[in-house]
């Protein structure tokens, strides 16, 4: 591991349509092979499908979904006296958002709908209703942290 200073965090510019940084980060997560235009089209089409299906503002639905996906606790491996313990720790805000977006996009890609636009839209709507694979991932993470609560005193 490098002993030099940590690289500075780069600021993400808000997207032009919704003026939101989290939407830009979603576009970056959806992007494959550097094709940002294609990724932006997928995300914006998914948002218009959400607006059509729910009648609510797509950005509000997305933010509700993200609140339902982002984890509060996770477990981290800690070596104590020759054995590894899964120690529950709180998740930092930046990592919460990153994990939430990662789980959302991965769950969308695993879905069965025909186009990525449909998969993303359905997964966001499911997450906003507290269902779907991405919310299940969060629940599993919280369950794991709860199960290992006995090791919380090993926190560092």
Swiss-Prot record:
Signal peptide: none annotated. Transmembrane segments: none annotated. One of its GO terms (cellular component) is small ribosomal subunit. Keywords: Ribonucleoprotein, Ribosomal protein, RNA-binding, rRNA-binding, tRNA-binding. InterPro entries: Ribosomal_uS7, Ribosomal_uS7_bac/org-type, Ribosomal_uS7_CS, Ribosomal_uS7_dom, Ribosomal_uS7_dom_sf. Pfam families: Ribosomal_S7. HAMAP family: Ribosomal_uS7_B. Belongs to the universal ribosomal protein uS7 family. This is Small ribosomal subunit protein uS7. It comes from Streptococcus pyogenes serotype M5 (strain Manfredo).
């Amino acid at each position: 591991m490098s002993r030099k200073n940590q690289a500075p965090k780069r600021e993400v510019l808000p997207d032009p349509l919704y003026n939101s940084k989290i939407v830009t980060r979603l576009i970056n997560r959806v992007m494959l092979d550097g094709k940002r235009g294609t990724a932006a089209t997928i995300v914006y089409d998914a948002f218009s499908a959400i607006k059509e299906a729910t009648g609510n503002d797509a950005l509000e639905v997305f933010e509700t979904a993200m609140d339902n996906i982002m984890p509060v606790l996770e477990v981290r491996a800690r070596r104590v006296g020759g054995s590894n313990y899964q120690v529950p720790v709180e998740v930092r805000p930046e990592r919460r958002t990153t994990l939430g977006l990662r789980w959302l996009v991965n769950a969308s890609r695993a879905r069965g709908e025909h186009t990525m636009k449909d998969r993303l839209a359905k997964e966001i709507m499911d997450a906003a209703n507290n269902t779907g694979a991405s919310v299940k991932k969060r629940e599993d993470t919280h369950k794991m942290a709860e199960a290992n609560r006995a090791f919380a005193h090993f926190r560092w």
